[in-house]
Curated annotation (Swiss-Prot):
It comes from the Bacteria. HAMAP family: Ribosomal_bL21 (MF_01363). The keyword Ribosomal protein applies. This is Large ribosomal subunit protein bL21. This protein binds to 23S rRNA in the presence of protein L20. Part of the 50S ribosomal subunit. Contacts protein L20. GO terms for molecular function: rRNA binding; structural constituent of ribosome. It holds the Pfam family Ribosomal_L21p. Keywords: Ribonucleoprotein, Ribosomal protein, RNA-binding, rRNA-binding.
Length: 107
């Protein structure tokens, strides 16, 4: 059984037990998170596609950690003027472990 969920303007294909990194969510490590935007669910060979979401479906996950991604260097330069700017950016992510995929009343 797997599901496709949308969070932080990105889509993730998840199974129970998977660990995924999503855009930062305002939660503490150890808390449970419910992802309501389930776009697709596959169960026992039957695929249910939402229009746009599957009604009654949700993914329950546990927050493992708040982490930062790799540093990206942003370098601006204008020729012949000695203009140079170098900055870095590290995106923040929330690491989740999928605990359950629930569809309708039965899960």
């Amino acid at each position: 059984m797997y599901a496709v969920v949308r969070t932080g303007s990105k889509q993730y294909r998840v199974r129970v037990g998977d660990v995924i990194e999503v855009e930062k969510l305002p939660v503490e490590p150890g808390q449970a998170v419910t992802l309501e935007e389930v776009l697709l669910v596959e169960r026992d060979g039957t695929v249910t596609v939402g229009q746009p979401v599957v009604p009654g479906a949700r993914v329950v996950a546990r927050v493992l950690d708040q982490v930062k991604g790799p540093k990206l260097i942003v370098f601006k330069m204008k020729p012949k003027t000695r203009y140079r700017r170098k900055t870095g950016h590290r995106q923040r992510y929330t690491r989740l472990q999928v605990e359950a995929i629930e569809v309708g009343a039965a899960s």
